[in-house]
């Protein structure tokens, strides 16, 4: 699954990669204003669009389903796996990779990154939550333990 992607970079050879994960009903442009406001140098921003259509409004969602029927997020995880591969192929190291997420994107940042078989530079969840607490406890990776987390 290839996620629709928007990118933004400050210079021609950035050394830091940041994945910006939008919230529920957002899209690949929702987090661009954050990047422009921060004006970080040497950064390439990657803004993926969630793969599922939001059921009750415009926009997209990272998780599809309900508590009653169950949740689908396979397309999301598969798409993020491919995005990490792309970022690596562009020459960015895991030590220079950050993930920032807002609301549902913050949830995804925690749920996904803490399952990775390696650590990254950091996670910045903003106004987020952990939806699947028991699953995360059971499935987190000890190899991701060095990933720094800045809760906002």
Residue positions per predicted region:
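Active-site signature of alpha/beta-hydrolase-fold catalytic machinery across serine-
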Residues: 33, 111-115
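A conserved short beta-strand
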Residues: 118-131
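Hydrolases whose catalytic domains are alpha/beta-hydrolase-1, hotdog thioesterase
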Residues: 108-112, 134
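The feature captures the conserved acid-bearing segment of alpha/beta-hydrolase catalytic domains
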Residues: 9, 130-152
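Serine-hydrolase catalytic machinery in alpha/beta-hydrolase-like enzymes
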Residues: 1-96
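Gly/Ala-rich beta-loop-alpha elbow adjacent to hydrolase catalytic centers
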Residues: 100-105, 109
């Amino acid at each position: 699954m290839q996620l629709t992607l928007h990118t933004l970079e400050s210079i021609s050879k950035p050394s830091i990669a940041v994945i910006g994960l939008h919230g529920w009903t957002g899209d690949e442009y929702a987090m661009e204003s954050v990047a422009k406001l921060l004006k970080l140098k040497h950064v390439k921003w990657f803004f993926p669009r969630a793969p599922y259509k939001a059921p009750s409004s415009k926009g997209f969602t990272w998780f599809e389903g309900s508590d009653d029927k169950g949740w689908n997020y396979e397309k999301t995880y598969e798409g993020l796996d491919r995005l990490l591969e792309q970022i690596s192929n562009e020459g960015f190291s895991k030590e220079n990779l950050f993930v920032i997420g807002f609301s549902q994107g913050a949830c995804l940042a925690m749920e996904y990154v803490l399952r990775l078989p390696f650590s990254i530079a950091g996670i910045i969840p903003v106004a987020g939550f952990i939806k699947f607490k028991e699953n995360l406890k059971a499935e987190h990776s000890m190899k991701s333990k060095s990933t720094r987390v800045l809760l906002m």
